[in-house]
Amino acid sequence: MIFDKDDFKAYDADLWNAIAKEEERQQNNIELIASENVVSKAVMAAQGSILTNKYAEGYPGRRYYGGTDVVDVVETLAIERAKEIFGAKFANVQPHSGSQANCAAYMSLIEPGDTVMGMDLASGGHLTHGAPVSFSGQTYNFVSYSVDPETELLDFDAILKQAQEVKPKLIVAGASAYSQIIDFSKFREIADAVGAKLMVDMAHIAGLVAAGLHPSPVPYAHITTTTTHKTLRGPRGGLILTNDEELAKKINSAIFPGIQGGPLEHVVAAKAVSFKEVLDPAFKEYAANVIKNSKAMADVFLQDPDFRIISGGTENHLFLVDVTKVVENGKVAQNLLDEVNITLNKNSIPYETLSPFKTSGIRIGAAAITARGFGEEESRKVAELIIKTLKNSENEAVLEEVRSAVKELTDAFPLYED
């Protein structure tokens, strides 16, 4: 049978050669994309398990198909661990992605056409926080709030004033490119003052929240969403949390049958594994090291007058750098660094003047290199290599030196131990 090949790599050589090349790329590249991480072998094993064969529409104890006793155990493990991690009363582990988690949260809290306040994309928000190209901006009347133009920090007085003017039904807090601590209690105060609900998307900082290194939004938000990858170091997927039983029912209905059919139980299993890893004391050490490494890299840029750190520094796993004094734009910087095996992404900065396809900045994250074992010394070295590359973009001899230095670092810290 074609479905029972023992030597599956030989059977589909084109595919497996591509996967092998990606494994080689990840091993030999320094990964600084803030939304990426390195999962454990246990997470990959669960995601590649026989659970992928099972369809299980519904929820534990309330399925539409038979033969779901085992997947009920798996999903319940994931649910209970998520609740324990974040101190939430209810958790839905079925969202296929963070965007779908956000979609379900909106469906549970507001109606199409309602006014919503979300963070401006250039200030650090996410596409699903009201960008016109996103379902969120097309379904709801989003009004964006921005950071202060001088400090590049959230200005809660300005946000309150704006909320009083636009009278939103919902305020969305959370970001994909904001390097400072977010005070969720102040967002809740603003929401209460104008009669709005509060939703928090903590996708980027969930691992730091889980480790107690960033204030948790769960006590303040009516609904909290997150991805399960990024700083949580789990599989790609979504998670929704709430302490409100009625909202939990709405969330469950919004996910299934609202926007999804059967859950991906093999991914739910991988989430369960990663949640167990998060509950291990070693995860707190990992999360603390992520912040240390992020700060170590940022400090190198702060000492160079040719670069500017947005908001003046970082208190989490990422930061933005304005590179326009050194190279034309963020896209040029991203491409140059790709050539020396350092991977990051171009990123808009507050009050951006360039298109999102070029940008003035780059975004640098420490989650993946920390997972590999990089410490503060190696992180500083990485920042120095970035600066060296961008300032010597036409000097092939210097670029080759950078490639060699990158290879030394990646060889010293393998992606996975054999």
Curated annotation (Swiss-Prot):
GO biological process: glycine biosynthetic process from serine; tetrahydrofolate interconversion
EC number: 2.1.2.1
Record site: Plays an important role in substrate specificity: 229
Molecular-function annotations in GO: glycine hydroxymethyltransferase activity; pyridoxal phosphate binding
Keywords, comma-separated and alphabetical: Amino-acid biosynthesis, Cytoplasm, One-carbon metabolism, Pyridoxal phosphate, Transferase
Residues recorded as bearing N6-(pyridoxal phosphate)lysine in the entry: 230
Record field: catalytic activity: (6R)-5,10-methylene-5,6,7,8-tetrahydrofolate + glycine + H2O = (6S)-5,6,7,8-tetrahydrofolate + L-serine
The UniProt record lists the keyword DNA damage: no
The protein's role, per its UniProt record: Catalyzes the reversible interconversion of serine and glycine with tetrahydrofolate (THF) serving as the one-carbon carrier. This reaction serves as the major source of one-carbon groups required for the biosynthesis of purines, thymidylate, methionine, and other important biomolecules. Also exhibits THF-independent aldolase activity toward beta-hydroxyamino acids, producing glycine and aldehydes, via a retro-aldol mechanism.
Protein name: Serine hydroxymethyltransferase
